[in-house]
Amino acid sequence: MGFVKVVKNKAYFKRYQVKFRRRREGKTDYYARKRLVIQDKNKYNTPKYRMIVRVTNRDIICQIAYARIEGDMIVCAAYAHELPKYGVKVGLTNYAAAYCTGLLLARRLLNRFGMXKIYGGQVEV
């Protein structure tokens, strides 16, 4: 066998640059995130909104967000644990609860932007 040089010496560790924290934790794929949040350059500083849905064991979280340099800004949010206030008592993590939570988010977003009168939704049952 020939001579094997030690690669991880003091100079190696002195110049080593760690990855971003969320990359080290395995939470963020920055390549996919870049493709998701970058707006077209001909749209001139217009935010690119996206809907984020997280399903936990006991809740469903829906959010509308857009990316800024300082971090993502949440415009509006709705949670499945708020649904009992509107009459949905059980099953807060199933398909129907996800639909209701998204509907609640949409109504809140329309109210926030003042478009609730334009898009009234279903009024007759």
From Swiss-Prot:
It is found in: Cytoplasm; Nucleus, Nucleolus. CDD domains: Ribosomal_L18_L5e. Gene3D superfamilies: 3.30.420.100. It holds the Pfam family Ribosomal_L5e. InterPro entries: Rbsml_uL18_euk (IPR005485). Keywords: Acetylation, Cytoplasm, Nucleus, Ribonucleoprotein, Ribosomal protein, RNA-binding, rRNA-binding. The modification N-acetylglycine is found at G2. GO terms for biological process: translation. The keyword Transferase does not apply. GO terms for molecular function: 5S rRNA binding; structural constituent of ribosome. The modification N6-acetyllysine is found at K5, K48. One of its GO terms (cellular component) is ribonucleoprotein complex. SUPFAM superfamilies: Translational machinery components. Component of the large ribosomal subunit (LSU). Part of the 5S RNP complex, which is a LSU subcomplex composed of the 5S RNA, RPL5 and RPL11. Component of a hexameric 5S RNP precursor complex, composed of 5S RNA, RRS1, RPF2/BXDC1, RPL5, RPL11 and HEATR3; this complex acts as a precursor for ribosome assembly. Interacts with NVL in an ATP-dependent manner. Interacts with RRP1B. Interacts with IPO5, IPO7 and KPNB1; these interactions may be involved in RPL5 nuclear import for the assembly of ribosomal subunits. Interacts with RRP1B. Belongs to the universal ribosomal protein uL18 family. Component of the ribosome, a large ribonucleoprotein complex responsible for the synthesis of proteins in the cell. The small ribosomal subunit (SSU) binds messenger RNAs (mRNAs) and translates the encoded message by selecting cognate aminoacyl-transfer RNA (tRNA) molecules. The large subunit (LSU) contains the ribosomal catalytic site termed the peptidyl transferase center (PTC), which catalyzes the formation of peptide bonds, thereby polymerizing the amino acids delivered by tRNAs into a polypeptide chain. This is Large ribosomal subunit protein uL18. It comes from Sus scrofa. The gene is RPL5.
